Amino acid sequence: MAPFRDLLLFAIATATCLAQSSGDGDAQKPLVSTDECKHPAYQTHILSKSPLVIYLEGFLTPEERAHLTEVTKDTFTHSAVADGGSEGLRKTRTSQSTNVPRDAAVRCIEERSLLFQGFDVPRTHLEPVQLVKYGQGEHYHFHTDWYTDAAAHARTSATGGNRLSSFFAYVAASDDITGGGTNFPMLEAPLDERWCKFIDCDEPWDRGVTFRPVVGNAVYWENLHPDGTGDERNLHAGLPVTSGWKIGMNIWTRQGPLGEDIRGPDV
């Protein structure tokens, strides 16, 4: 993990320098675009190096966001909580969720997440892309994305292992939304006021970092220590929406490959 983290930080710094030297200092150039996938020139902002947490400005295009909401319309059900390969409904998570059919647009988003993590991460390590919808009063209490159950390692080793990394992107939100931020209580709040576009700078300093639900943007973080154990510092919560609604997107990368019975087919 440590060499991967160093390589990722070096790649981000190099890409940013190249973008600035080309005369376009406002946006990071995409690493790769193909005839099928035109990746946006999103910007990267490193919030924390340990644990690694990176903010991605403009990670999703308006067209992708509209497509995601359209193809998942009327498919949301009450969100389950998974740990150690089992799922259940709990009061700690009151949102609704749905898996997104892996069509061409979704495969492009998957490709973007893989390119961001380096060329050596196979597509089969990705869980199905998930959307989550939060209405007024709905929330997800403090949790980690990595499986905390001590017996989970044996059960999940045959199904991809633990969650290596996470993306959480903001797909849509109502104009009147209040609340609904993503809070990391163990992260140190940055001092630079430019972060106030993306985080709630009115929060008390001892509340950690709360990312605002800014549509199109995303947060990336690593879930595990170099030895493969879970990093408790990335504990986070989906704070209650006090008015309006929001839709977010989860992209989880596992340690190993997942079978088609879990990932599902291309459509």
What spans do the regions from the language model cover?
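Fe(II)/2-oxoglutarate oxygenase catalytic core
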Residues: 2-267
